[in-house]
């Protein structure tokens, strides 16, 4: 029988990250882990305040579906149990990871997707003086 657990991992941000909506000194990540026999699937979600999410609200959402997940709810049923957001993402990723580990087949193959490749990303410069922002952008 699967078991669902949730925890918080905190990662310090070098200096302060400042944008118009506020400042951050750490990134809090909610981790969902689903264990079943010898396999453990893991997924993450980062609560996003702009959408009304907090670490506590994401943990509560995960807790609200614990019995369904432990009773065998799958990724399809999960879509009806939780709204889009960090909690659903964390559990969905944990279910994909668990299925991949059980089968010995990478998650992207199970999903029918192409192999992962490097992607371009963006970096947001913190609000500061023009000189500080120019230095950070250099």
Description of each model-found segment:
Residues 1-138:
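N-terminal capping/lid subdomain adjacent to the active-site entrance of alpha/beta enzymes
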């Amino acid at each position: 029988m699967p078991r669902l657990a949730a925890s918080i991992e905190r990662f310090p941000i070098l200096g302060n990250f400042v944008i118009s909506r506020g400042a951050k000194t750490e990134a809090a990540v909610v981790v969902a882990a689903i264990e079943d026999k010898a396999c453990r699937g893991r997924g993450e979600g980062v609560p996003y305040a702009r959408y009304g999410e907090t670490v506590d609200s994401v943990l509560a959402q995960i807790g609200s579906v614990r019995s369904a997940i432990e009773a065998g709810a799958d990724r399809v049923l999960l879509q009806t149990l939780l709204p889009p957001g960090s909690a659903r993402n964390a559990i969905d990723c944990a279910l994909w990871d668990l299925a991949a580990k059980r089968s010995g087949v990478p998650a992207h193959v199970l999903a029918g997707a192409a192999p992962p490749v490097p992607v371009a990303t963006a970096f947001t410069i913190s609000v500061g003086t023009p000189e500080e922002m120019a230095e950070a952008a250099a």
